[in-house]
Amino acid sequence: MSNKNFPLIFERSKEGRTSYSLPELDVESFDLEAELGSEYVRQTPPELPEVSELDIIRHYTGLSNRNYGVDSGFYPLGSCTMKYNPKINEDIARLDGFSHIHPYQDVSTVQGAMAMMFDLQESLKEITGMHEVSLQSAAGAQGEWTALMMIRAFHESRGDYGRTKVIVPDSAHGTNPASAAVAGFEAVTVKSNQEGLVDLDDLRQVVGEDTAALMLTNPNTLGLFEKDILTMAEIVHEAGGKLYYDGANLNAIMGYVRPGDMGFDAVHLNLHKTFTGPHGGGGPGSGPVGVSEELAAFLPKPLIVKKNDGYDFDENRPQSIGRVKPFYGNFGINLRAYTYIRTMGAEGLKKVSEYAVLNANYMMRQLEDVFELPYPQHCKHEFVLSGSKQKKLGVRTLDMAKRLLDFGYHPPTIYFPLNVEEGLMVEPTETESKETLDGFIDTMRTIAKEVEENPEIVQEAPHQTIVKRMDETRAARKPVLRYHP
């Protein structure tokens, strides 16, 4: 059944209709205005919809039918690792011992949850090669900021207040320079070379006595492994700086190489990406931070520790940067990640990376004759095509991304990283079959042919979606954020 004419919840409203019934008021009414003052009390009631329970159910069911997620179809959003989230994660998360507890409970009454979090810390230490891990950060960007605050605290503990700059590659995630700025640093860009990797000569030029850290993703955002990482670590460390690992692309290297073994001093992980917490809807996420022994004293407190009589919170950490989130992280996402790690095991996680890399390289080689491939070497978990060939024919990458919607696919990430013209960043992940990959490849080839033979159909896409071509510029500059009857 089509829901193209799906009404807004306000349009379902009819005065006097309700979805509830309450008994007669048997207590004294409370005069808010007299108690709080008129400036804190609405003079007119809010314009809320008046609907029945059935209206509400149909409204949200209709919205869910319009939604698109990993369970709906292929979701090759580059640098987001939109893999399938095993449903056993949800089964475990719904166990009473996890779902019916409260963070204010005495630690002695939640020893099972404490054991899980401690074991997760230990697993992440092993996976990353870090000395200690905190689960507190809520998501990736906060994990970046947390790591940078620890690096800042480390330098200041040594009286080294002149380290005011953080180096960020030109292919980095936008959150990297943003996190550096929020942490009080100046972001400095290091260029990529012709291979799409960090230019070592330029790195040597920008590193100095004012360098606090180099932020790096490896593989980088182009899906390419920074093969000179040991040299880069040496350059930064000789200058007195620290090397920070953005864990966005860990899905490509698990079981093969660890950030700690590459010389990184701090790392954040995206448990909602690599370790199958459901994401894409705005949260929650989880961004644990791991550090070397030299930085461990500065981790957010408390840490979970194992004692002879059970598990406890360690609050006695005088050099800690303090809490970065209430309680102890996003427990539900941490639990799902723990379930995934225990389900897969060490060999399973290694296979994850193998298949993620295999799928990406297969797709890249199947499409390199149709689209420009700026960096033709083997990729890791993702690759970046360029729509520059199609742009010369009057069709932009944005147009092709919208055309993909007509075929039932979520588009790849577009126009990122910024150092690729008309970029299309594709990350298939390990959970997709060859048949799914082939279907997407055929669709991309079909769209490329349309660009040559019938460009208007691509330029005016999408045609089959409930909402057609939107004016993104107007939406960004003049958003309508509330209902006006």
Swiss-Prot record:
What family does the entry list?
A: Belongs to the GcvP family. C-terminal subunit subfamily.
Where are the N6-(pyridoxal phosphate)lysine modifications? 273
Under the heading InterPro entries, the entry gives: GcvPB (IPR023012), GDC-P_C (IPR049316), GDC-P_N (IPR049315), GDC_P (IPR020581), PyrdxlP-dep_Trfase (IPR015424), PyrdxlP-dep_Trfase_major (IPR015421), PyrdxlP-dep_Trfase_small (IPR015422)
In which organism is this protein found?
Oceanobacillus iheyensis (strain DSM 14371 / CIP 107618 / JCM 11309 / KCTC 3954 / HTE831)
Principal EC category = oxidoreductase
A Pfam short name: GDC-P
What UniProt keywords apply to this chain's record, in alphabetical order?
Oxidoreductase, Pyridoxal phosphate
Function statement: The glycine cleavage system catalyzes the degradation of glycine. The P protein binds the alpha-amino group of glycine through its pyridoxal phosphate cofactor; CO(2) is released and the remaining methylamine moiety is then transferred to the lipoamide cofactor of the H protein.
Gene name of this polypeptide = gcvPB
Top-rank lineage group of the source organism: Bacteria
Enzyme Commission (EC) number: 1.4.4.2
The record's PANTHER family line, in alphabetical order, gives:
GLYCINE DEHYDROGENASE (DECARBOXYLATING), MITOCHONDRIAL, GLYCINE DEHYDROGENASE, DECARBOXYLATING
Could you identify this protein by its name?
Probable glycine dehydrogenase (decarboxylating) subunit 2
A biological process from GO: glycine decarboxylation via glycine cleavage system
Catalytic activity annotated for this protein?
A: N(6)-[(R)-lipoyl]-L-lysyl-[glycine-cleavage complex H protein] + glycine + H(+) = N(6)-[(R)-S(8)-aminomethyldihydrolipoyl]-L-lysyl-[glycine-cleavage complex H protein] + CO2
Q: Which cofactor does it need?
A: pyridoxal 5'-phosphate
Q: Name one GO molecular function term.
A: pyridoxal phosphate binding
CDD domains listed in its UniProt record? GDC-P
Q: How does it assemble?
A: The glycine cleavage system is composed of four proteins: P, T, L and H. In this organism, the P 'protein' is a heterodimer of two subunits.
Q: Which GO terms describe its cellular component?
A: cytosol; glycine cleavage complex
The protein's matches in SUPFAM superfamilies, at most eight in alphabetical order, are given as:
PLP-dependent transferases
Its taxonomic path starts at:
Bacteria, Bacillati, Bacillota, Bacilli, Bacillales
The question of whether Oxidoreductase is a record keyword is answered with yes
